[in-house]
Amino acid sequence: MRRVFACVCVLGCLSTSAQEARKPAPRDPGPDSQYRLGPDSMPQEGVPKGEIKGPFTLPSQAYPGTQHTYWVYVPAQYDPAVPAALMVFQDGQAFKNETGDMRAQNVMDNLIYRREIPVMIGVFINPGRRPDQPEPTPRNWGDRDTNRPTEYNTLDDRYARVVTEELMPALAKDYNISKDPEMHGIGGSSSGAIAAFTVAWERPDHFRKVLSNVGSFVNLRGGHVYPEKVLAAEKKPIRVYLCDGRNDNRGMRNGRYDETRDWFLQNVRLMKALQQKGYDVNYAWGMNNHGQKFGGAILPDMMRWLWRDGPVSTDPNDAVERDFRRPAVKKD
């Protein structure tokens, strides 16, 4: 009887071992698996919601034959009598996507309400396209069928002209936006990030805050030379937050390594050049791939840091300062 029992146990163990062997090996967590949006990126009960207006179409003089689609975020606290700050996001469709990784409108709603950033007009602008080309979407950002590569990756002032000479005058017709360049920020992801940096680099008299997520400071159209440009040029009055990941595109092409196309390396190089030159620069290096998971998770912190020096009252009797920002009173 003991022998029979022993045989049964052995067979049972063998059967269990065979079943375990057939199970797929546990998958390693992906580089983006640890990043989640926090409460600052979600709609919160009691927080006034801003309004997104648009889409609007802006014909371009800088790139004849093309047009830019954009949307305008107007916070509930916007008062036309008070000049507002300005934040411009490239690849606007991705930054305003309600189910995407950034959800910038929610971030602005929450941080404005808590006085952690100033009241600001937000702009979500897409790359230019001809009228016969498709509008970029969260699935197709337009690299193959719009003017995105030319506008965003080229190191010249043409896209800066779109923002400063075409977009900003259009906004000024409808909104009271501060003329102080310290109150103007610009940001983006990937090629949209280097585009944002280039706008501030070319026009620091208009933009002085740059938000860069997985910025394409690589040799797509010469962006890898920015560290050398920073070191060679006179220091400019801009503040920069760089965000990238160790698993971004790392420069392997056809089995060969090309450091000029290593996103992470080139972001680190730019950070070091900015530090060496004495710029006001902050940075965060994650584990992320080339995308917006990490950038979206820390977007509230990036915005707080960029806009940290807004005016503040220290009067203990200032009841307004010690209260949340309430919606502006609508005037008839």
Model-assigned labels for residue ranges:
Residues 19-332:
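Non-catalytic cap/lid and distal C-terminal segments of serine-dependent acyl enzymes
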Residues 6-13:
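Bacterial N-terminal signal peptides
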Residues 1-4:
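Positively charged n-region of N-terminal signal peptides that target proteins for export
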Residues 14-18:
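Sec/Tat signal peptide C-region and signal peptidase I cleavage site
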